[in-house]
């Protein structure tokens, strides 16, 4: 389900703008100013990047998406995988008070309560206790082992804030005259729990993070005004190919996550699962992406990518291995025609898609495929009353449980399957890997049978990266930490 780590769609030149080798790094994130500076726990991609830069959690992610120390300088995991014990770095809060295990316990417990009602709370449901063991040692206990628990703890939403401030590694200031701009500078090494370093300011660069529309960001990059553009999606991908990008390159993350159409209501044409399946059967998924020229993008017909199971035979590549596309479409035609004959209504489906030229291309391709089976497609105006809504979301960790949690009925996003939720809930306390795998497979089967979602493939995330930018790496999580961009590479 993952495509090539660095997909070069514009040519890379050896000569870089020398002015970009020093001075502030200018970064544009495709986001709104309001979303960029959002507080709380429901963060846009831009806000995630800003939170990760200014408010660390126990651990963090490096440019390649690997877990690294943050407030916790080291940790151990017990042999049974049920206890994670962290030793905190010898450091202070911005007001000068020492960081203690009691502080972290309170902040983590508060954050877990704040997350209630979100999919991230479901991901964190294995946490049974947060204990302060000594002044700088804290323990998190789990209901059953979770190999990627540290990656989950590194999510920006788990960055810890006390009295309105985090512990860095960067500090933010804002310009009164520019509500879309955040200026970020590194904290001194000793305030980050590291040895003091003489003249450290001479080696660290400052960073300006600006929220922009996709078109504005691409134009600014082409004009040499920004060094890096983040948070490009399929909806905006055609904009990245506008104009000569001779001073940089497009990089596409090998993203893991959900990209498909969520069924909003069981009404009309979509009232029966067999007709929802008919729409899924009729799609030429590889053809949907062809207009974008994204080589290596792997379509999928499943909610949980088959590659996440240790045994590929547990989830074959195709849902309909004995049927080719033409055969599937003939079945879809019959099901749609039977409904039209029974009701006398026209088969029409409305889709809510984000703004952008990529959405127009995607809609056109879907309309072509469904038109072949007798279904007319409309774009929902303002998203109101849509039959289907695009779900475009990056995974936080590579387990079937993340995918299953995205359709939990408590989230009230669209159609769901209560029996799937119950199976995932049962798996929270199961220690045996084979039994847990069985529960996940049954939960996935329940969601598939309910036809709550029409999967298309992995999400698309692209960036524009100038050659002088260091410490940037495409990764499957789509998070690109800002702090390493400002640090010397030697």
Model-derived features: where do they sit?
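Extracytoplasmic/peripheral linker and loop segments enriched in polar/acidic and small residues
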Residues: 17, 379, 402-467
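N-terminal lobe/hinge region of extracytoplasmic solute-binding protein
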Residues: 29-79, 109
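Aromatic- and charge-enriched surface segment that lines or borders ligand/interaction sites
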Residues: 74-117, 269-271
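Extracellular/periplasmic solute-recognition and catalytic clefts
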Residues: 177-185, 193-195, 208-266, 392
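Structural transition elements
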Residues: 298-339, 356-360
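Long beta-strand-rich cores associated with HINT superfamily self-processing modules
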Residues: 465-490
